[in-house]
Structures are given as structure tokens and as C-alpha cells.
């Protein structure tokens, strides 16, 4: 039975991010890497998350923390609202909202992730989280205030 890709593309997982997570295909840009990393969180694939972090981040040292985070978190959806990259500079940025539920409470991660490309491979480096006031417009583009949208 086919399974829809958790990234929200409407494609089957095996034809979408599953090909990147399995290593069959390399992420062609930071947006695809971000989507595949989100899928790895959904599928609880610590190995792929560690592999897709830049080696200087030493993500393997946090394997136990990554796995522990899987226990109580259910991922509800990913919205990418901005992505830019420069092949010439081998850098890219993806701004997203990842919704989740943890111990009965919903939440959202809003981040601008930074990526670097080395030897034909994109890697996640780190991210920054914007400081949003409750009355600010929601960055997802809904037109609602943050407090009535992703900030709930």
C-alpha cells in the first residue's frame, strides 16, 4: 500500500522524500533536504537526520537525544514559506513552520534553516527562530495574526 509523503507534496513517500532518505537520490536543493529531514523526524530515522547534518555539527553525539525526542512527538505538517539558495556560494536558506503535538499539546517550530553544499551534497547547518509577537502577522502567509494561527 502506498503512503503519502509526510512533506505534504501529494506524492507517494517512496517516489518523493523516501528516495532521498534512502540514499537513492541526493537532495537537489535545500528545500528538498528540508522536506526529507522533516520526513525523517516523522519516520523516526535518526540515522538520516545525523547524516544530513553537516559533519562539523557532530550530530552523532546527540543521537540519544534525537531518539528520545521521537517518543512523545507526533508531527502534524510542514509548510515551507521561503527558500533561497546560491549554487555559486553553495549556501541556502529555508524558512518553514513544522507543526507537532507533544503530550496532548500542539506547537510549532518556526525556523529559518541554513544549509551548505559540499562535494555535491547539501547539509543542514543550523537555524534561527524569529521573535514574533502575538499580534504580528503569521509568517505562514495565512493573513491571520500569529496568535490565531501557528502561535496557538
Swiss-Prot record:
SUPFAM superfamilies: NTF2-like, Sec-C motif. The lineage of its organism: Bacteria, Pseudomonadati, Pseudomonadota, Gammaproteobacteria, Enterobacterales. PANTHER family: ADENYLATE CYCLASE-ASSOCIATED CAP C-TERMINAL DOMAIN-CONTAINING PROTEIN (PTHR33747:SF1), UPF0225 PROTEIN SCO1677 (PTHR33747). Gene3D superfamilies: 3.10.450.50. It comes from Salmonella paratyphi A (strain AKU_12601). This is UPF0225 protein YchJ. InterPro entries: NTF2-like_dom_sf, SEC_C_motif, UPF0225, YchJ-like_M. It holds the Pfam family YchJ_M-like. Belongs to the UPF0225 family.
Amino acid at each position: 500500500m502506498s503512503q503519502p509523503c509526510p512533506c505534504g507534496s501529494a506524492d507517494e513517500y517512496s517516489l518523493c522524500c523516501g528516495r532521498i532518505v534512502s540514499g537513492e537520490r541526493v537532495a537537489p536543493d535545500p528545500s528538498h533536504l528540508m522536506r526529507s529531514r522533516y520526513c525523517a523526524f516523522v519516520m523516526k530515522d535518526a540515522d538520516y537526520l545525523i547524516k544530513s547534518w553537516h559533519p562539523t555539527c557532530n550530530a552523532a553525539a546527540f543521537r540519544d537525544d534525537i531518539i528520545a525526542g521521537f517518543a512523545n512527538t507526533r508531527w502534524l505538517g510542514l509548510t515551507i514559506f521561503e527558500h533561497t539558495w546560491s549554487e555559486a556560494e553553495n549556501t541556502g536558506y529555508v524558512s518553514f513552520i513544522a507543526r507537532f503535538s507533544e503530550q496532548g499539546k500542539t506547537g510549532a517550530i518556526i525556523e529559518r534553516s541554513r544549509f551548505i553544499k559540499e562535494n555535491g551534497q547539501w547539509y543542514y547547518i543550523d537555524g534561527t527562530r524569529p521573535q514574533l509577537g502575538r499580534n504580528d502577522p503569521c509568517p505562514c502567509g495565512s493573513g491571520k495574526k500569529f496568535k490565531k494561527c501557528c502561535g496557538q
